[in-house]
Regions:
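Aromatic (phenylalanine/tyrosine) cluster motif
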Residues: 3-4, 10-13
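Conserved, mostly hydrophobic/aromatic
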Residues: 48, 88, 136, 149, ...
């Protein structure tokens, strides 16, 4: 049984009575449908009174040339969700744009904010029919922490209050500049850095990787994001074939790369399985996988070594805590994608710190184009890593961040 006891309330889940442990035969689908462990006879005295959504736009000068986007980004959009109770408490979160939520507010108003499993089921159906509204789940977790007087990492299991970060770059620089950036990450204490491929010819990507390895030696773990799992609407380039991915894997083996991320289209499970069997480099995927059963299939199908769903984009914390545990029961790594904004990074950090054993968590940081000030513009204080690369989470109830109300007012567009 896995849960957190906060006096009279329980946040977590119990396996059904006929499944002795989480590793029993047939545990995977059972775990996906695990029932909530909030005591039904001790309902919260709080009720959801309002849900407010606002949209914000931060101008970017200089532009951010993201490796996964063929268009320079001249602004950064973010959506903020606030869930308030009749007692005046408020949970805040950010992530996806909440498209499709309008008209569904009545499904939550008047309900117990601690009925997280109930709200998760509603959000899952909204996801299927309309759009991804998972920031609401994150806001409900922030609110739950404030109601119960505990930080989210503790509600999720309290495994640790901190998680180590890897520096996640976002731009494509020439080999020398890429090596310079890696040296800066090393000096700042990060244990690992993720480099991006997508220069048109993967051989040019390998040249940049060689320059970095030559500069930092074995002092940094190197991760590679191949950027082949999905495309933006205006990018019609085909994903790599299996033979392309295998050829790249051979180069990454030579350069002692820790993992290769999204080397194939996100739906090519057979290709990922074959690639995983053919290479010593860990295969990572799952950042844009939309449904929990698809993540389950990546795990149980032997397709990945590293699973990377983002709580701000799929499943929320309520859904991904299932996936995090299932991943670990299969002796794989669970370390989320976090490229939304500081609130999204923080939510994923709470999830990992609370219940997952992972070597490091993604920390989007590639100045000057992607600075902490840009990434975390919604927050009064940026989320930082210390001189050894550790993110230490707050003891404050909920997520532990506060919105920058003046900045939100100045950047609001809807």
């Amino acid at each position: 049984m896995l849960f957190f006891d906060a006096g009279s309330e329980f946040l977590g889940f119990e396996p059904p009575r006929d499944c002795g442990t989480l590793t029993c035969k047939g545990a995977s689908p059972t775990l996906m449908n695990a029932r909530p462990a909030i005591a039904p006879s001790r309902a919260s005295a709080h009720k959801i009174a309002s849900i407010a959504i606002s949209h914000h736009r931060l101008p970017l000068q200089p532009p951010f040339n993201a490796s996964w986007d063929t268009k320079p980004r001249v602004h950064f959009d973010a959506t903020v969700v606030r869930v308030s109770t009749d007692s005046g408490l408020c949970g805040v979160a950010s992530g996806d744009r909440m498209l499709g939520f309008e008209g569904h507010e009545d499904l939550f108003l008047g309900h117990d904010p601690l009925a997280l499993e109930r709200h998760y089921r509603v959000l899952s159906s909204i996801d299927f029919h309309y759009g991804r509204c998972w920031p609401l789940d994150l806001a409900l977790w922030d609110l739950a922490g404030k109601i119960l007087g505990a930080p989210c990492w503790k509600l999720l299991g309290g495994l640790s209050q901190r998680v180590r970060a890897y520096a996640s770059s976002g731009t494509l620089r020439d080999p020398c500049a890429q090596a310079d950036a890696a040296e800066r990450y090393l000096a700042q204490g990060f244990p690992a850095v993720k480099l991006r491929f997508h220069r048109g010819d993967w051989r040019d990507d390998v040249k940049a990787l060689e320059a970095v390895r030559g500069r930092v030696g074995n002092r940094l773990e190197l991760l590679v994001d191949c950027n082949q799992g999905w495309r933006l609407p205006w990018d019609t380039e085909a994903a790599w074939t299996f033979k392309d991915a295998l050829a790249v894997a051979r180069e990454l083996e030579r350069l002692d790369v820790y993992w290769m991320e999204e080397p194939l289209h996100r739906a090519d499970h057979a290709g990922m399985r074959a690639l995983r069997e053919a290479t010593d480099v860990r295969v990572a995927a799952g950042e844009m996988t939309r449904q929990l059963h698809e993540l389950r299939d990546l795990i149980t199908g032997g397709c990945v070594d590293v699973l990377q769903p983002d709580a701000a984009l799929v499943g929320g914390i309520t859904g991904l805590r299932r996936i995090a545990i299932l991943t670990q029961e299969h002796h794989l790594l669970f370390t989320p994608h976090t490229w939304t904004n500081g609130m999204g990074v923080t939510a994923n950090a709470h999830l990992v710190a609370g219940l997952a054993d992972t070597p490091f968590l993604e920390f989007p940081f590639d100045p000057p184009e992607w600075s902490l000030q840009r990434r975390d513009f919604l927050m009064s204080e940026p989320l930082v890593a210390d001189g050894a690369g550790w993110i230490t989470l707050s003891d404050s109830p909920g997520m532990g961040y506060a919105p920058d109300e003046a900045r939100l007012l100045a950047t609001r567009v809807a």
